[in-house]
């Protein structure tokens, strides 16, 4: 779904473990890494879209995670001009995202990036909390920085076993 300003409505997912590390996923057939994310369908809430994307991209179900928090506002990034598909109607110029912070409550072995016929990712690993901000593609960097700043206090509490 694309809004009136040309932004595709989307959810982003940060998954953390008990050590405060976050799941970092490798895009299929590329050497490009990112957090799981995906579009919101017309009839879905952001939370419903998040659970659908969680299953489609990582093979995880609602019982495998716990929602710790989400952003209370939409974050946007613009696509570089060479990535915009100008011949589509409506034209999508970027993403408008709600982000969720999840705690993985199941074993790592439940993560399956090849659970669909057209996987988004072909690998994943745990990385330190701030690592993605430095490593994500440049046009997403500001959004990642904002998300991680907002989620930092929750991950700190997990590391201290307070939540």
From Swiss-Prot:
Gene Ontology CC: one annotated term: cytoplasm
Any one Gene Ontology BP term = mRNA catabolic process
Task performed by this protein: Accelerates the degradation of transcripts by removing pyrophosphate from the 5'-end of triphosphorylated RNA, leading to a more labile monophosphorylated state that can stimulate subsequent ribonuclease cleavage.
Provide the alphabetized UniProt keywords: Hydrolase, Metal-binding
* UniProt cofactor(s): a divalent metal cation
Keyword Metal-binding among record annotations:
yes
Disulphides? none
Using the record's annotation, list all stretches that form the Nudix hydrolase domain: 6-149
Read off the InterPro entries from this record.
Nudix_hydrolase (IPR020476), NUDIX_hydrolase-like_dom_sf (IPR015797), NUDIX_hydrolase_CS (IPR020084), NUDIX_hydrolase_dom (IPR000086), RppH (IPR022927)
- The protein's Enzyme Commission number: 3.6.1.-
Q: Which molecular function terms from Gene Ontology are attached?
A: metal ion binding; mRNA 5'-diphosphatase activity
Q: Which of the seven top EC classes does this enzyme belong to?
A: hydrolase
Residue ranges annotated as motif Nudix box: 38-59
Gene expressing this chain: rppH
Q: Which domain of life is it from?
A: Bacteria
Name the chain's protein: RNA pyrophosphohydrolase
Task: Quote the HAMAP family the UniProt record gives.
Answer: Nudix_RppH
SUPFAM superfamilies found in the cross-reference section: Nudix
Q: Which family does it belong to?
A: Belongs to the Nudix hydrolase family. RppH subfamily.
């Amino acid at each position: 779904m694309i809004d009136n300003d040309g932004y595709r409505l989307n959810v982003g997912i940060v998954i953390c473990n008990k050590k405060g590390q976050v799941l970092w996923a490798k895009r299929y057939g590329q050497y490009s890494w990112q957090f799981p994310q995906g579009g919101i369908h017309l009839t879905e809430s952001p939370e419903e879209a998040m659970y659908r994307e969680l299953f489609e991209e990582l093979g995880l179900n609602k019982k495998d995670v716990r929602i710790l928090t989400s952003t209370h506002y939409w974050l946007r990034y613009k696509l570089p001009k060479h990535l915009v598909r100008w011949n589509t109607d409506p034209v999508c110029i970027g993403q408008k995202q709600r982000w969720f912070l999840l705690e993985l409550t199941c074993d790592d072995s439940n993560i399956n990036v090849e659970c669909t016929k057209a996987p988004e990712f072909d690998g994943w690993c745990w990385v330190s909390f701030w690592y993605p901000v430095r490593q994500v593609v440049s046009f997403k960097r500001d959004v990642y920085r904002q998300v991680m700043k907002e989620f930092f206090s929750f991950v700190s509490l997990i590391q201290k076993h307070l939540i």
